[in-house]
Amino acid sequence: FAAYARSFNAPIRTGVEVFSAERLVGRPGFRIDTSQGGIEAQRIVAATGPFQRPVIPAIAPQSQAIQQLHSAHYFNPQQLPEGGVLVIGAGSSGVQIADELQRAGRAVWLSVGAHDRPPRRYRQRDFCWWLGVLGMWDAAANAPGKEHVTIAVSGARGGHTVDFRQLAHQGVTLVGQTRGFDGDKALFHPDLAENIRRGDASYLALLDAADAWVARNGMDLPEEPSAREFLPDPACVTDPLLSLNLAEAGIGTIIWATGYTTDYRWLKVNAFDDAQRPQHHRGVSTEPGVYFLGLPWLSRRGSTFIWGVWHDAKYI
């Protein structure tokens, strides 16, 4: 990063916290208040990304008898009180935390919602490589109303494909998406088997696309038939729990691996809808002089990533 900045003498200031930005009164431009004083600018590009503030759903119980924390504040099993753990959310954070806790000897329940679970590696190539050669980084933005689901992939122990059946056979109890709480009881949707089936479908679809690409291009990448072999469905999938008494199960902690949201409270301009989502077209805001970068699916799948954001930066 430092070398790239030096290559064109970018006037970068590091270690600066922005407190607020708002329009100047009586003349064009904006005033930005920072930890190193005020700055005036004619344009603002907000490239702070979508992961600014941890989200815990409103269904979280109000009980003080059990510790609750967001995955953003989880560091290791030793920080948690004794007892079992209910991990809610089975994206990359949730599955890796559940795996680590189970390996540390904890009793773990993992609440699994809708997800994609791509292969970490397939035919000696990383998942990110496959997204590139298959053109998936440049896939157009999701159509309005199309569901966005979390991605379950692990970087632990060198990285590996997430396999929910393997987690269950390892000792993690899988449950469906959490729908609420009733006193000491956690309540789950009866959707566990369907969520796993859909995750399998997304996984197999990528393997099929990769195999077809290898055949078309005559690449010498070894076949990997074992990637299509699944363990049998464990009992927690074939006969899933629909409720769980936390006290009776000895659960002392709930970890909410439920993602993040944006936080634009510092940007005091008329560029947001009623839900405080940026209003823009390909990053060009409805507020003149304000632009956004790094948002999910801003124009394509890669818009949130370093290797994909350049398309949107060039457009702006």
Specify the residue positions occupied by each region the protein language model found.
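Flavin (primarily FAD) cofactor-binding/catalytic cores of flavoenzymes
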Residues: A2-I316
